[in-house]
Design a protein with these regions (language model features):
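N-terminal domain-onset segments
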Residues: 1-79, 113-121
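Short, compact, well-ordered microdomains
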Residues: 80-121
Length: 121
C-alpha cells in the first residue's frame, strides 16, 4: 500500500541523493556524470512514495515506489551509503530509479528514522 513520504523521509532521501557515497565509485567515469545522475534522482523525488516496510521489527527501512509502482531490480544497481552512530543508511538505485531505503542498525538495536543531520558521509 503506497503512502506519501513524510517530510523527514523526503529530507533523508534527498540528503542521501545529494551527498552519500556510492559503494562503487567507479560506476561512472567523471564527476560531471555523477552530478547529472544525482540531479536526475532529485528531480524524481516528487514522484516517490513509500511502499512496504521491512518486517524485521528493528528498522524503519522501506520500499520506494515511483508513480505508486514498485521499482524492478535493475541490471545496473548503485548503492549510496552513509553512516549514523547506530548503523548504516543505504539508498538502492536500480537502473537510475530509487528502489529501497535501508536503515540497518548495529547489532540488535532498534532504530527510528534518523534525522538527515545524523548522516555521516
Amino acid at each position: 500500500m503506497a503512502r506519501s513520504l513524510t517530510e523527514a523521509e523526503r529530507q533523508l532521501i534527498s540528503a542521501m541523493i545529494t551527498s552519500a557515497k556510492a559503494t562503487n565509485p567507479n560506476q561512472y567515469d567523471t564527476q560531471e556524470t555523477w552530478q547529472n545522475w544525482r540531479q536526475d534522482l532529485l528531480q524524481m523525488l516528487d514522484r516517490i512514495t513509500a511502499g512496504d516496510a521491512c518486517e524485521c521489527g528493528k528498522c524503519p527501512s522501506f520500499q520506494l515506489l515511483v508513480d505508486n509502482k514498485p521499482v524492478q531490480a535493475g541490471k545496473n544497481q548503485i548503492i549510496l551509503e552513509a553512516f549514523i552512530s547506530e548503523g548504516l543508511v543505504m539508498l538502492f538505485v536500480d537502473d537510475g530509479i530509487p528502489s529501497y531505503l535501508e536503515i540497518a542498525p548495529n547489532l540488535d538495536v532498534q532504530l527510528d528514522l534518523p534525522d538527515e543531520e545524523a548522516l555521516i558521509f
